Structures are given as structure tokens and as C-alpha cells.
Amino acid sequence: MLTNMSLFNEKKLISFWHDNKELLFYFTRRVRREQIQVVAGYLSYVCLMSLVPLIVVMLSVMTAFPLFAELQQSIEQFVYQNFVPAAGDVVQQYLTGFVANASKMSAVAISFLFLAALLLISSIDNTFNKIWRVTDKRRTITSFAMYWMVLTLGPILVGASIALSSYLVSIVAVDEYDVLGLSDMFLRMLPLLSSIIAFIILYIAVPNKAVPFRFALSGAIVAGVLFELAKKAFALYITAFPSYQVIYGALATIPIIFLWVYVSWIIVLTGALITVSLQEYEILKEKKVKESDRAQVKDEEIS
């Protein structure tokens, strides 16, 4: 029985490799060509320079709405616990102070915060369009309007989605709705689902090119799973190997955040390359089929 199962699994692996080896080779070539480790380093640098202004601006916009102002603390805890492993408490403490200070800033200083936040969004936009090989770039006015919508409507949508998630969690957590421990399963899956949804939106909305949902979903699932695994591995490393604290002392938070941002961008770009590889490979297959059909028609005409 075990022998038959092993033979069956081996045949499935061989069949999977035979069916997808060309796609895997194409994906590998794209990864090498795009040099994602270099691009991730560039985005990490821009992110560290612009992330604090971006978060300060978005949280400031969110606090302008009474409903989201009440949810701000729970929203911050959700983001830091699920997207900044191990160092979330320290980061939250600093950013809370930054947001409080932002309310005392002048209009000129706040405008510079907006410009720094726009720099990060613009860098992400340019990087994704380069990966998708977009030739028709958006007009400057269109790009600025889109970036402005991200800064203003983005916090509202994030707040609404987390409020909805909190409502669903409260419903599922009620004993009468808890069937076969589904509430615990839902709570465990919520960070992964949130990551996948965020990646889907990123891969579809950012490139100035039509991206089929099924390809964005495939890339988002891989990126989401890698992101969750990376969070657990990163938290394990920080708790089990605290040697970085001995080396850096009070500055230990800085390399931790930089390393995590770099790993996060590697994962984001990997998911993007999976999405674009699936999209481009399907186009190449369609071209090959059409060329084969044309060659067959020519052979029939000659014969």
C-alpha cells in the first residue's frame, strides 16, 4: 500500500515538473533579470526614509474621523502585531509619539510629510511598472491624483476593513456560532487572509496594465504564506538569538526594522514576479499555439 502511494506521489511530482518546468525556468530568468535583491535594498532605503511620514500622515487622516479615531488603538495593535514581528511594541511607541507631534506641526512641515510619503508611493509605482514592462506611463496629474487618493482614502478603507474584521471576529467568537472550533481557526487565519487581500490589491491596482485576478491571486497566496512564515521565523530568531542586542545595545531596533523591511520587500517582489511570470507565460503559450497553427495550415496548403 505504501509502495503504491509512493509511486503515485512520484508520478504526480514528475507530471508536475514536466508540465511546469518551462514556467519555473521563465520565472527564474525573470528573478535574475530584475535583480530583486538590489531592488529590495533600494525600496528598503526609500521605505525607511518615507515610512514614518507615510504612517504619520495616514494615522493623522484616520484620527480626523470620529469612528476611526476610536478604533485607532486597535488598528495600530493589529498592524504592528501582524506586520512588524517582535519589534512592534517599540515601533508603536515611537510612531504614537510622532503622530502626537504631527498635530503640533505647521502647514509647511505637514506638506513635507506628504511629499515624503508620496516619494515612497511613487517608488513602489515605478518599480512595479518596470517589473510589468509598462511602456505607457500614467500622466503626471493622474499619478499625483492616485497617490493622493492612497494617502487620503487609504486610511479610511483600512479603518473600515479592520472595523469589519473586528465585527466578524466578535460574531464568530460567540459560543453559539462557534462550531467545531471555527472561531479559533478564523482568528488564526485572519492575518494570512489580510496579507493575501493586501497583496491582491497591490498586484492589480499598482501596475498600469491589466492584471488578471487569477494570476494576482496566485502571486498573493505565495507572498502571503511566505510573509507569515517569515514573521514566525523572524520572531523566533529575535527571541532565540538575542546577540544583536549585545552588539547594538540601545540601537538594536534600527537593524531589526531594516532587516525586516528588506525581507518584506523580497517577499512582495517575489509575489509580483510570480504574477507577471504567469501572465507573460500564458501570452507566450498562446503565441506558440498560433504559430503552430499557422505552420500547420501552410504545410496543408503546400501538400
From Swiss-Prot:
The Gene Ontology CC terms held by the record are: plasma membrane
Instruction: Give compartment(s).
Output: Cell inner membrane
Keyword Ligase listed: no
| Its membrane topology | Multi-pass membrane protein
Report the superkingdom from the record.
Bacteria
What the record says about family reads: Belongs to the UPF0761 family.
| Name recorded for this polypeptide | UPF0761 membrane protein CPS_0609
Native organism: Colwellia psychrerythraea (strain 34H / ATCC BAA-681) (Vibrio psychroerythus)
